Amino acid sequence: MSDSKYQEFSKKYVRSGRDVIVPKEKNPFKQMKFDTFRLENSPDFGGLGGHVDWGYICDPVNMFPDAAVSESARHLTILGGNPVNYLELHGEVEITLGHNRDDLHVFRFNESVSVYVEKGMFYNINVTKIDSPARPIHYNELVYGDIIPEAAEVAGEDIGEGYRKYLKSGKVLHAVNQPHHEVIYPVIYVGSPMFGAAEPIRRTWMPVSEPHTLANKAHYHKYLEYIVFYGTNPDDPLDLGGIVEFTIGENEDDLTVFTIDKSTQFFVKPGLWHSPMVFSEIRDRNKPIIFCEVSYAPGFGGPDQTVWIDGISPYPPAPPEN
């Protein structure tokens, strides 16, 4: 690939540097004392609208004391600040949900939790305790854009504590069946089907602590996804903490390897060849590189949705989602 074509390709499919950072001065809450890492689904980068944020909450904060109305459907995921085990919250959080102000319900958690907030629902996040400043809470927000299909209401009946259908916590978030056995730390998975929601949005957080290769050969999907690599240094979200070599290309005979040492996002449109992804250097196994996949597609995970360059999947069939 020529230099000019490489630059054109990069502009189309790759984002890094200050383009993916929300400066801490622009964070909505002063308790978020570090820059936030943002994936913007802009017209020239996927075109879905909406955004995904990865940030840190350093001190207790009551975000919306009067409960805010969600103008778009969104997923909010609150993880512990230790990437070696995101499941351990090392703090406490209260989540308020309701379909109107006269019917608000408060749920308390001392373990990591994900919440699905329907469009028009009232909600609040109140972080009441953080055990240690060295372990700020890792806060992730996925906000739907106008182009992403809105889901129907989450399935289920509001009986007793029925709003719990919008909340998943603790070991439920642990992707125990993920096929990458080289990844020794818990992998986090959050998907709309977990909540009974109709729209096919899924995310994974995979902490990679040792040099090795994930997805060892090129393939493409029939759905849209973003491949995100970010570091776990709150002081500098652009610090990847190592080196990743990621292969990507518009046809199988013209693949290019991008070598990155900064937190970087890749837009992978349907049919775009990608992988292998080689984690060639990890500076500190206690500060792993996070491989995060954000997927938008019907039928995600089905064997007919992925095409491998040699026609053979290296992974066993995935178990059905519950």
Model-flagged regions — what are they?
Residues 53, 112-120, 135-143, 202-204:
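Extended, hydrophobic interaction surfaces within ordered domains
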Residues 1-67, 151-218:
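A short, N-terminal "cap"/entry segment at the start of jelly-roll beta-barrel domains
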Residues 79-81, 121, 230-232, 264, ...:
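Short, flexible loop/turn elements at secondary-structure junctions
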Residues 99-129, 252-280:
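Conserved metal-binding segment of the jelly-roll/cupin
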Residues 78-110, 229-261:
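A short beta-strand-loop-beta hairpin characteristic of the jelly-roll/cupin
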Residues 2-18, 22, 126-175, 238, ...:
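Double-stranded beta-helix
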Residues 71-74, 222-225:
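Extended extracellular/luminal ectodomain segments enriched in beta-structured repeat modules
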Residues 59-62, 97-102, 119-121, 211-213, ...:
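Short acidic (Asp/Glu) patches
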